[in-house]
Amino acid sequence: MSEFKRIPPEQALELRKKEGAVVVDIRDPQAFAAGHITGARHLDNHSVADFIRNADLDAPTLVVCYHGNSSQSAAAYLVGQGFSDVYSVDGGFELWRATYPAETAQGNAE
């Protein structure tokens, strides 16, 4: 894949469950702590280098922001860093939470 793909929450959930997709959340730390997709990793300018260094570049990677806009830039960045299977989740965490409230968690980034 030379570009990222935009997908709805339904397809993102399927990728998580069937292919073990990695979920990265680029929202601010307070928003992440207040609620995020279960199993998501918080990603920011301070953690992105370590994430890239330790990541499986071929693993499906889902990028989530607030509403699905900023995640597109972050997804494009990851593709540029060598990731081959990157998705931006349309509607962001807000639509995910409305669609799958049971698939959310609270707490700070690890």
Swiss-Prot record:
What PROSITE patterns does the annotation carry?
A: RHODANESE_3 (PS50206)
- CDD domains in the cross-refs: GlpE_ST (cd01444)
Q: Which GO terms describe its biological process?
A: glycerol metabolic process
Q: Does the keyword Nucleotide-binding apply?
A: no
**One function term, GO molecular function aspect:** thiosulfate-cyanide sulfurtransferase activity
Into which EC class is this enzyme placed? transferase
Catalyzed chemical reaction(s): thiosulfate + hydrogen cyanide = thiocyanate + sulfite + 2 H(+); thiosulfate + [thioredoxin]-dithiol = [thioredoxin]-disulfide + hydrogen sulfide + sulfite + 2 H(+)
Q: Name one GO cellular component term.
A: cytoplasm
Where the record annotates domain Rhodanese, the positions are 17-105
Which keywords belong to this entry?
Answer: Cytoplasm, Transferase
Q: What does this protein do?
A: Transferase that catalyzes the transfer of sulfur from thiosulfate to thiophilic acceptors such as cyanide or dithiols. May function in a CysM-independent thiosulfate assimilation pathway by catalyzing the conversion of thiosulfate to sulfite, which can then be used for L-cysteine biosynthesis.
**HAMAP family assigned:** Thiosulf_sulfurtr
Q: What is this protein called?
A: Thiosulfate sulfurtransferase GlpE
- What gene does this protein come from? glpE
